[in-house]
């Protein structure tokens, strides 16, 4: 009788997960047949890494079964690094359950070669953090990092957990880091991109730069660092509220503004239409101003 072989069992399990989910991973090709991987989100829409796709009029989507469809960009969001392509014909979509990433658990990153055939990489979930904001202002429900190596052509494919459930889409982060855009973020952002072409984000119409609060004012300000107003957009929320160039922004609704990331966190997709209180230093005095956050103008 053959001895039980755990490695063989693991190999067969991974093989089964790839077979079950390979329909999720597709190739997106341009006219020169360069390609990136993507996730087939629904029969007529694929999602991939925004940073990996240019601005061509048309792309070709190729599935593992060899089916092809012409696709055009429906929307893109640099903030969450997501881009959605809408296909001109429906493709056979694979349905898998959604899962949750856990530190130390196995992760299976799928991709596609230029002909649409599945590729697979096995690694570990190295960290799972709370909600965070990218430098471009995008809100992501979790910060998931993988201990795994991906080729650039494999970026944008689905990431599965050890049970074969979908936890998100792979993307290349800082050098040497592979991140996962969580399935919860995909579920929130993709419908917005399909309907509106972009994700609305809050806007104050202010150009800001970090600055130290002058020593004599720190006691009244209650802050050591703020954001100096360097420029003001004509007709923007800041100008309407009476903000002046040279003002130092201390807080927004009581939250300290000690860097651009903190400002971005106050101007996410949920902030549009809110009235907030700005606490400012002007001419050596601390004052407040109410401002209505509007949507950032389309680029």
Residue locations for each model-derived region?
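PDZ/PDZ-like domain micro-motif
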Residues: 153-159, 212-221, 233-251, 266
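Active-site region of chymotrypsin-like
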Residues: 22-24, 83-94, 119-176, 183, ...
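Short loop/turn microsegments at loop-to-beta-strand junctions
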Residues: 35-36, 154-156, 227-230, 244-245, ...
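Conserved active-site neighborhood of the chymotrypsin/trypsin-like protease fold
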Residues: 2-6, 30-119, 143-144, 152-153, ...
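C-terminal cap/linker of serine protease catalytic domains
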Residues: 1-18, 109, 162, 166-224, ...
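Gly/Ser-enriched beta-turn/beta-hairpin loop segments
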Residues: 74-81, 128-145, 192-200, 211-226
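Conserved PDZ fold ligand-binding element
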Residues: 43-48, 166-167, 238-261
């Amino acid at each position: 009788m053959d001895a039980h072989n755990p490695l063989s069992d693991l190999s067969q399990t991974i093989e089964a997960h790839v077979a079950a989910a390979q329909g999720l991973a597709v190739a997106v090709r341009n006219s020169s047949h360069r390609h990136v991987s993507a996730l087939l989100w629904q029969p007529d829409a694929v999602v991939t890494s925004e940073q990996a796709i240019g601005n061509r009029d048309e792309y070709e989507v190729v599935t593992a079964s060899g089916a092809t469809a012409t696709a055009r960009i429906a929307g893109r969001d640099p903030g969450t690094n997501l881009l959605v392509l809408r296909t001109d014909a429906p493709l056979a979509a694979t349905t898998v359950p959604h899962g949750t990433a856990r530190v130390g658990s196995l992760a299976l990153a799928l991709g596609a070669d230029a002909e649409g055939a599945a590729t697979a990489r096995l690694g570990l979930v190295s960290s799972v953090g709370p909600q965070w904001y990218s430098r471009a202002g995008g809100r992501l429900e979790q910060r998931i990092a993988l201990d795994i190596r991906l080729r650039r052509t494999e970026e944008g494919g689905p990431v599965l957990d050890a049970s074969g459930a979908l936890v998100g889409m792979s993307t290349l982060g800082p050098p040497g880091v592979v991140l996962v855009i969580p399935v919860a973020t995909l579920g929130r952002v993709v419908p917005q991109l399909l309907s509106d072409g972009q994700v609305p984000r809050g806007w104050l119409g202010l150009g800001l730069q970090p600055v130290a609060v002058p020593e004599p004012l720190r006691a009244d300000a209650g802050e050591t660092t703020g954001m100096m107003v360097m420029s003001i957009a004509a007709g923007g929320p800041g100008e309407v509220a009476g903000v002046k160039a040279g003002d130092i922004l201390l807080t927004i609704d009581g939250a300290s503004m000690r860097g651009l990331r903190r400002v971005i966190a106050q101007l996410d997709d949920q902030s549009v239409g809110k009235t907030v209180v700005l606490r400012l230093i002007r001419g050596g005095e601390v004052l407040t101003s109410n401002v209505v956050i509007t949507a950032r103008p389309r680029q």
